[in-house]
Amino acid sequence: MTRCNPLFPYVYRLGMPIFDRLFYRRYRRQAMGNATGRLLMVGLGPGTDLMFLPPAVTSVAAVEPEPAMRRMASALARRRGIAVDIVDGIGESIPFPDNSFDSVHVGLVLCSVDDVAATLAEIRRVLAPGGRLVVLEHVRGDGAMGRFQDLIAKPWSWLASGCEPNRRTVDAIAAAGFDTGRLHSIRRTLVPPPCTPHLQGFATVVKAGA
C-alpha cells in the first residue's frame, strides 16, 4: 500500500469515528456479518472492524503495512479482549500459506493497494475452497461523480496515503475470478465525495466450468 502522507494514520484515526457514526458503523457490521470461520483482514487500519466480528468467526489474522495503524489496532484488540494475529504485510504479498482462510475481509482498502489485481490474486490464493471475499469499499461512481473522481484522483491519492477514489473495484473482483452476484452498490450515503458510492457484500471464487 502506498505510503504518501505521514500524517494520514493520525488524521484517519481522528476523523473516521465521525464517519462511523454517520454511516460506516451500520455497513461495517453488515459486511462483517458475511465472515465465517478463519478470517483474514487485509489492511486492518486502526482495527475498527474488529468491533463487529460475528460469532461465526473462529479465528482472526490481519495484515497491515503501517506501524502506526498496527499499534492502534493492537491497542483496540487488547482493550476489547479480541484475539488477533496482526502482522506486517501488504495485500500484494500476503504472508500466509495457500488455502489458509475461510473468509478474507477488505474494508476500505482496495482503493489504496498499489496493485489491485495482485492483491485479489493473493486473496484468492489464501482462501480455502468455498471461501468468501467480504467487501466494504468505496468505488468510482457513474456520470458526473465518476468524472469528478477522475479529476481529483492524483491530489486525493497523496492526501489520503494512496487512496484512489475512482477505482472500478467490482470489475476488478470479477476479473480476478470471483462471482460478484452477492455484491451490491450503495449509491446514496452521508459520506461526501469523492468517497462514494460504496460496494458491499461478499464474493466467492467462480467454480471451474461454471
State what each model feature region is.
Residues G130-H138:
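Conserved beta-strand signature within the Rossmann-like core of class I S-adenosyl-L-methionine
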Residues E92-V104:
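A short acidic, Gly/Pro-enriched loop at the edge of an enzyme's catalytic core
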